[in-house]
Structures are given as structure tokens and as C-alpha cells.
């Protein structure tokens, strides 16, 4: 259970050094590849015709295999972390698939570690590239993708479930239903908040005065957290988790961070990465299905601020601020370094919320 986690990649118990080993593309070992190939063989009932590991960053291992006709995508964990959230991811994609939402089809999920040393999912292999490919190449049609994103998120947020926060794995496993593990949205929002603020202050990333202003904003706006019903949120709706063409979204992947909560939080995540004109078009598209008011727009900045805290923390301790210009996060619409951009987004959020 993710009972004491706000954002898994930032807050789970692995050491920083272990996270660095796990999150980067050179993490694949002979043992991890061998285990994955055994899973593929077990699934097919015979040796796969094709099998390759995909050199991707992130907290999972990714592989491609085929039986000579159908292609499959295999995703595993490291077998070390006590986390079974793949069950939630698979249940979410199954539910969304019933509504014809563009998500991968899942064929198998296992988290019991009985037969293999890792937890895993087997899904359809989608050959369409991520939108980050086009973003990095400067060929992305921002207006079209903003409209597509607004439509997708508005449809996603029509899916509502009891409680808040991460999906309760015990309930999902025992009762076969989706619900959150927190009784209130505020309980989830405040998880690890003191840790995030303390880290940023202790490492002199944010000043004591800035921390005080942030705490004041969260206290003053805490009534926004009093919501009665939560929507399904992706919580990492970024270009690398969206597949498609320069003009069109074809699938949304990686539901590892999905929670039940305030729809404005999902848009706050998007706002962490995108320019005002992108957000304006997205909101126009979003509001065609789910009308928004000025309070909703202010809440987007409220959640942008909350999410930029953990983002800045993980970017610092993972050494992202020291990566060269080729690092994918170093490209942004303000043409700033990643550290400058992170601090600018925090300052923008504070300034927007201070004028309310």
C-alpha cells in the first residue's frame, strides 16, 4: 500500500543511489533480461521469435517480444520494492478500455513473485512513438495536441470512484472494485508535504521566506481540498506518456501514478510543463465537456505549486539539474536550464495565487 506516499518515484523508500541505478536506461542486467525472457516464454508457451529489452529510463524495465505475428510489450519492476500498484494500473486500463478510451490492452498481470523474481504486466505493443519524440524535434503541433489533450482529460475525469488518493490494492484484490485509500482529498494532498518543503529549504533551493509564502498559500486555500467526489487522474500526463503523431493523440500509457482526486490537479501537472497558450487551448477543449470557472483555473496553479515541490526535489537529488542539454527535461518553452525553469514555475504559481 502507498499509504505514506505522495508521488511514488519521489517518495518511496529506496535510497537515492538505488533510484539512480533503477531509473536510468543502463540498468538492464543479465539477470533482469533473463527473468523477463522467461516470463515471455511462459506467456507464449514457447520461445519468443523476437525478444529485446527497450533502453528506456524510468522506474520499470521494458521489453518487446513476439510470437512471430503478434507483438507484445512486457513491463517489469525490480522485484525489490514492496509495491503492487501494477494491479491498479491494469484495472484502470481495463475500465477505461470499456469506454473506448485510448489505452493499451492488458493481457496479463502478476505481482505475487511466486514464479518469477519480478512483478510484471504484458500488454499490446504500440509502435506509435511518444509525443516527446516530436517535441524534441520541434515538429509537434501544439494547438492540435492541446485540443486533443483537453478532450482526453475531460473524458477521463468523467470516471469517478469512492474515496481519494492511490487505489486501495486490498479492496481491489478482495472486492474487485476501484476506490481510493484515503478518506479525504486533503489527506492525500498533505502527504510528504513537510518532507518536500524541508528538503528544498535544507538544500537551499528555496529560501525560508519562499517556504513561508508557500505554507501561507496552502493554509489560505485549504478549503479547495474539501471535495466530495473524486475523479480518476493520470497524474503524469506528459509528452513521454502520450503516444501519437505530431497532430493526434493515439494512446496514453504509464498509469503508475494514477489517483482519485480533483480534476484540476491533473491540469496542474500539465501546467508544470507547458506554456500559457497551450493551457488556454487545452482548457477551451476541456470545458466543452466539463465546464470550468475562474476558481478551477486558480486551482490549476494551486496544484502546479504543490507538484513543482516534489518535482524540484527529485530533480535535485537525482542530479537532473547537472545533466547536459541533451537530457530530455532540459528542453522547455522558456529556454531556461532545468533548475531555472523549476524555480520559475514555483515563482509563477506563488505570484498567481498571492493575488487572489
Summary of predicted features, one role per range:
Residues 27-47, 114, 141-147, 154-234, ...:
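An alpha-helical support segment within catalytic cores of ATP-dependent transferases
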Residues 2-46:
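Juxta-kinase regulatory segment immediately upstream of eukaryotic protein kinase catalytic domains
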Residues 91, 139-140, 251, 268-270, ...:
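Glycine-rich, phosphate-binding/catalytic loops in enzymes
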Residues 147, 226-229, 269-356:
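Helix-rich C-terminal or lid/interface subdomains of diverse kinases
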Residues 33-34, 90, 280:
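Short, surface-exposed alpha-helical segments at coil->helix boundaries
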Residues 58-65, 74, 106, 156, ...:
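Active-site acidic catalytic loop and adjacent metal/ATP-binding pocket
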Residues 50-190, 205:
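ATP-binding pocket architecture of kinase catalytic cores
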Residues 45-52, 207-211, 291-299:
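Short, surface-exposed acidic
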Amino acid at each position: 500500500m502507498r499509504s505514506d506516499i505522495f508521488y511514488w518515484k519521489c517518495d518511496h523508500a529506496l535510497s537515492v543511489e538505488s533510484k539512480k541505478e533503477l531509473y536510468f536506461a543502463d540498468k538492464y542486467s543479465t539477470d533482469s533480461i533473463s527473468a523477463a525472457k522467461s516470463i515471455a516464454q511462459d506467456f507464449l508457451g514457447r520461445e519468443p521469435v523476437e525478444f529485446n529489452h527497450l533502453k528506456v529510463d524510468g522506474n520499470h524495465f521494458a521489453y518487446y517480444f513476439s510470437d512471430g505475428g503478434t507483438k507484445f510489450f512486457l513491463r517489469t519492476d525490480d522485484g525489490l520494492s514492496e509495491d503492487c500498484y501494477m494491479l491498479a494500473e491494469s484495472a484502470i486500463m481495463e475500465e477505461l478500455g470499456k469506454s473506448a478510451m485510448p489505452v493499451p490492452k492488458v493481457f496479463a498481470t502478476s505481482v505475487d513473485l511466486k514464479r518469477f523474481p519480478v512483478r510484471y504486466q504484458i500488454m499490446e505493443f504500440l509502435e506509435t512513438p511518444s509525443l516527446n519524440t516530436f517535441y524534441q524535434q520541434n515538429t509537434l503541433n501544439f494547438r492540435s495536441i492541446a485540443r486533443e489533450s483537453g478532450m482526453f482529460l475531460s473524458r477521463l475525469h468523467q470516471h469517478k470512484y469512492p474515496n481519494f488518493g492511490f487505489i486501495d490494492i486490498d479492496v481491489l484484490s478482495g472486492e474487485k472494485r476501484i476506490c481510493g485509500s484515503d478518506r479525504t482529498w486533503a489527506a492525500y494532498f498533505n502527504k510528504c508535504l513537510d518532507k518536500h518543503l524541508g528538503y528544498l529549504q535544507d538544500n537551499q533551493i528555496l529560501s525560508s521566506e519562499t517556504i513561508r509564502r508557500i505554507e501561507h498559500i496552502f493554509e489560505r486555500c485549504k478549503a479547495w481540498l474539501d471535495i466530495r467526489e473524486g475523479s480518476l487522474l493520470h497524474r503524469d500526463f506528459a509528452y513521454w506518456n502520450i503516444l501519437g503523431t505530431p497532430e493526434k493523440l493515439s494512446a496514453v500509457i504509464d498509469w503508475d501514478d494514477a489517483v482519485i482526486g480533483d480534476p484540476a490537479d491533473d491540469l496542474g501537472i500539465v501546467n508544470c510543463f507547458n506554456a500559457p497558450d497551450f493551457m488556454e487551448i487545452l482548457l477551451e477543449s476541456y470545458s466543452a465537456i466539463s465546464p470550468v470557472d475562474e476558481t478551477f483555473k486558480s486551482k490549476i496553479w494551486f496544484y502546479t505549486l504543490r507538484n513543482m515541490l516534489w518535482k524540484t526535489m527529485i530533480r535535485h537529488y537525482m542530479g537532473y539539474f547537472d545533466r547536459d542539454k541533451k537530457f530530455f527535461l532540459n528542453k522547455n518553452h522558456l529556454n531556461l536550464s532545468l533548475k531555472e525553469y523549476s524555480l520559475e514555475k514555483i515563482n509563477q504559481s506563488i505570484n498567481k495565487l498571492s493575488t487572489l
